[in-house]
Amino acid sequence: MLDRLWEVRQALPLYLLVSTLGLAISCCFTLICPHVCRLIPALTTYGKAADQQEDNSLVEKISVPKKWFKHFYAIGLLTLFICLHTVHSLIYNPNYLHPVVLKILATLTRSYSIPPITPSTSILALLLISLHVARRLYETIFVSVYSDSRMNLFHYAVGIVHYIILPISIMCETQGVASKLPQLHVSIDDISLTQWAGAVLFWICNWKQHQLAEQIANTRKGPRGLIRNYAYGICFGGWFNLVSCPHFLFEICIYLSLFLVIPDAYVYRFIIMFVCINQTFAALITHSWYHKTFPKYPKSRKALIPYVL
C-alpha cells in the first residue's frame, strides 16, 4: 500500500492527478455556478465558449491566438523524435544515457520496480502517437479555419506540457531507461494480437477524427475550399446528428485504444483520466454554448456520447 502511495507521489502521476482534480473543480464551477467566481470560467473556457464570458482584462492580457494550437503538436513531434531516438539507441548501447539522466527520468514515474514496457511495445506506441500528433499538426495548419478567438496562457501551457509528458511517460517506463537490463531487443513477435487490435483501432479513430475536422472546417469554406466566413455554424450529418462534439468523443477513443497497446503503463492511466475529464467537460461546455447561441439547435443531440450524455 505504501509503495502504491509513493508511486502517486512521483512527479508525473502527481502532476496529472493535481491537474485533473483542478480541471474538474474549475469546470464544475463553469457549468453549475459561473457567477460565483468569474475568473474561473474565463480561465476554463477558450475559443467560442470563451467569447461568451464577460470581459476579463487580466485573462485578456495573458491570452494567445487559438491558432497557436499548432505549437502543441510541433513541440510534441520534437519530443517524440527525441524519445524514439533514445529508446532505439538504448537497444544497441545500454550506456547511451548518462547515469544522472537516468536518475532524473526515474524520479518522473515509478522507480521501485522494473518498468513493464518492452522496447518493442514502446516503439510501437511512440510511432502511433507520432502518427496522431503529426495528423493534428497537419490539420491545424492546412485544414482548420481559425477565427480571432483566443485562449489564455493557462490552456496554452497545459497543452504544451501534455504533449511533452505523453511520450516521456512511455519512455520512462521502457526497459533500459529506468532500469538496466543486460540485453534489449526489438521483435514483432513481442507484440500481442490485443496490441495489434489496439493499433488498428487507434488508426481508425484517427481517421474518423480527421474526417470530423474537415467537416467542421467546411462550415466556413465555400464549394472551392475558399474561406467564406469566420462565423460559427452548426454541423449536420453523421456523428453530428447524434452529438455536438464527436471529435472530442474520438479523442477519448484514441487514448483508450492506445491503452490496449500499453496496458501495463502506469503514468498513462493518469493521462487517460485527464483526457477523459478534459474532453467530457469541454463537450458539455461547448454543448451548452450551442444551445445558448442557436435557439433552434437540435434538442435531440447529446453533448458527447450518443443517447447518453
Curated annotation (Swiss-Prot):
It is an enzyme of class 1 (oxidoreductase). Its EC number is 1.3.1.94. It is found in: Endoplasmic reticulum membrane. The chain crosses the membrane at residues 12-32, 72-92, 114-134, 151-171, 184-204, 242-262, 270-290. Disulfide bonds: none annotated. Pfam families: Steroid_dh. InterPro entries: 3-oxo-5_a-steroid_4-DH_C, Dfg10/SRD5A3. Pathway: Protein modification; protein glycosylation. GO terms for biological process: dolichol biosynthetic process; dolichol metabolic process; dolichol-linked oligosaccharide biosynthetic process; polyprenol catabolic process. Belongs to the steroid 5-alpha reductase family. Polyprenal reductase subfamily. This is Polyprenal reductase.
